[in-house]
Design a protein with these regions (language model features):
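Membrane helix-loop-helix hairpins that form the core translocation module of multi-pass transporters
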Residues: 32-93, 97-100, 149-160, 165, ...
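Juxtamembrane transmembrane-helix termini in multi-pass membrane transport proteins
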Residues: 1-61, 121-142
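Conserved substrate/cofactor phosphate-moiety recognition/catalytic segment
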Residues: 116
Length: 185
């Protein structure tokens, strides 16, 4: 349960203000079928994060060195500081609109997650916990927790929530996780 909860909270916080939240907002404005968007996000996240968690698990299992916990915890701190850098509002192309909400959400979310903070966090969580199933389940839940409200109430939320303050809180959690892990060594 710890792996699931840590993975969920970590990705939920990492996702705040991320480009995929902006993507959710843009897709929700373009498509009326919210359920298809959510299912597309879910499918893309499960595949992307399962591969990422597996990679982290594989790396920690195949590079059994006493430096691995140090590398993982320092990486959490680095991701924490990375969260302080706002993502750019990337334009969503309209060339895939004819495929429908599900396929557009699936393709764009899968691509947007490649090399993203949440994918890096998922790799790190996979390396730390060596539990592909629970990390994938937790990180997928985190993505949905962060994106479903944006799909349904994005414009109203973005006008009321000071994103810069939330970004600092999310960054602090990552840095504290890394520091806690370093102290535990």
């Amino acid at each position: 349960m710890e792996v699931f909860l840590t993975s969920t909270v970590t990705v939920t916080l990492a996702e705040i203000g991320d480009k995929t939240q902006l993507l959710s907002l843009l897709l929700a404005a373009r498509f009326h079928n919210k359920i298809a968007l959510i299912i597309g996000i879910l499918a893309a996240t499960i595949i992307n994060h399962a591969l990422s968690a597996w990679l982290g698990d594989w790396l920690s299992g195949n590079f059994t060195t006493h430096y691995m916990p140090l590398i993982v915890n320092i990486s959490f701190i680095v991701v924490g500081f990375w969260l302080l850098i706002p993502d750019k509002d990337e334009e969503v192309t309209q060339k895939y609109d004819h495929f429908g909400a599900f396929l557009v959400a699936f393709v764009l979310f899968f691509i947007a997650e490649i090399g993203d903070k949440t994918q890096i966090a998922t790799i790190l969580l996979g390396a730390q916990y060596q539990s592909v199933f629970w990390v994938t389940l937790g990180t997928t839940a985190g993505m949905l927790i962060a994106n479903i409200p944006i799909i349904y109430a994005g414009n109203a939320l973005l006008q009321k929530i000071p994103l810069s303050k939330i970004r600092v809180i999310a960054a602090s959690v990552f840095v504290l996780l890394g520091i806690y892990g370093l102290i535990a060594l």
